Amino acid sequence: MALLTVQNLSAGYEGKPVASGISFSVSSGDYLTIVGENGSGKTTLMKTVLGLLPPVSGKVELGDGLRKNRIGYVPQQTAGQKGFPASVLEVVLSGCLGKSGLFYSKKEKDLATKQMRRMEILPLQNRAYRELSGGQQKRALLARALCAADSMLLLDEPAAGLDPVVTQEMYEVIQSLNREGVAIVMISHDIQAALIYSKTILHLAEKPLYYGDVFGYKREYFLEGEQHA
Amino acid sequence: MLETLLHYLSFPFVRYALIVGVLIALCSSLLGVVLVLKRLSYIGDSLSHIAFGAMAAATALNLSDNLLLVLPVTIVVSILILYSGGRTKIQGDAALAMLSVGSLAVGYMLFNLFPPKGGNVSGDVCTTLFGSTSILTLTKEEVWLSVILSAAVVILFVIFYHRIFSLTFDEDFARATGMRTGLYQLGMAAVVATVISLAMNLVGSLLISALLVFPALSSMRVFHSFKKVVICSAIFGVSAALLGLLVSILVGTPVGATIVAADMAGFFLFGLIGLFKKGRTA
Ligand SMILES: Nc1ncnc2c1ncn2[C@@H]1O[C@H](COP(=O)(O)OP(=O)(O)O)[C@@H](O)[C@H]1O
Ligand SMILES: [Mg+2]
């Protein structure tokens, strides 16, 4: 059974599609990377999948008992978060809101601790989020997303703004989560990394240019290692 | 000096002023944290000008309690701003500037066309803009209304504290975790409007922004967690209001301006503390 099924979806704003004809599905253990140029509608697609935007047409279905508030989402950094006063723990705990009552119980605090340990940021839990490095901030956002759901993560350009070493680390963290059974849907314009780490690729333009496994994508776009940009 | 103070405190209207002043400052400083972090402080400013227009209209209509008109008008406009803000992004701030300066002008016009009975126009305008004496002339009913509304604001803030954090830090994520953010924004718009209507009595329309902005900005310079910023902001706002009120009662300076002066002094103090802390950790 698929965790997420998208059928003939058009995603866009106020009834005007940005990208259309999109179909794909994500099952447990999958690792899908959505690639495409800036402005091709990757973020718009992800927000539609999350229910933040209404679909222009087509369908988004969540399966296997996955509820709307049980998807882990790692958004791109927004400008407002740069100087925001919040401790790492406060940020991570906010991932439990979909499950908690008005206040956090021990269960949610334990969950936050567990996910921070998993992301190796437990010692940073009382530090200021705004003073962390870019990579540490991304780990905090990952831990927050994992608190919300650990069957599927949706990540919007998780490597944006990170230096090459930290980028590499980030991809490895995401891969290890995938090996632990977390389905990954990731937006990236780092095609090289997508080819290495992911299992399926969705190449988005106004219409999807490609959807299928990595090997087919390599054959189609990278004949003998020669890059068609 | 203590004796003079005790003497003043024996008057009920002075006690009323202190109670209401502290409560309004508390609410404003809590909401201010959210407004500053969401970069919406300009909305507070605009709403306070709208409230001035509504106050003028209420005076012209000779209402028994001006709040009866000011409160609903400000709440409705606040909600309208919230909704139009989502749609017409491009010139939203210019439209808001137009609306707020327009209601200032119309308000002043109304004060002149329908001067309050027995009052003088410039005195009334001055009171409504700068809150010169209104806090000292509260009736018992006004005091109760302020107490109840402020208590409601504080209780709501505490109950929904974690959700307010999530909504402020990352709206998209909050929605993705199932939060009905539209509802919370509606509530927030109504609460901000309520606090601004109440604050008209304390500092007057032009100085309300100070109550919202100074405590939050000062606390953010010193503290790094949301909880500490919220708590510090509340203490900061209340202390500045108390200090300003006491000084103005003792020395006879205008209430609103004295409170804002206390806020400014606190801001510089916290700025220095922030620099000092940074210097030690760097
Ligand atoms: N809030 C919005 N309203 C209308 N159009 C938007 C909005 N946000 C983005 N767009 C447009 O949608 C297109 C796709 O944007 P986006 O999904 O962010 O692209 P990507 O993430 O692939 O870089 C762009 O042309 C952009 O201008
Ligand atoms: Mg994008």
Predicted features and spans:
Chain A
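Helix N-cap at the start of a conserved alpha-helix in ABC-type nucleotide-binding domains
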Residues: P164-V166
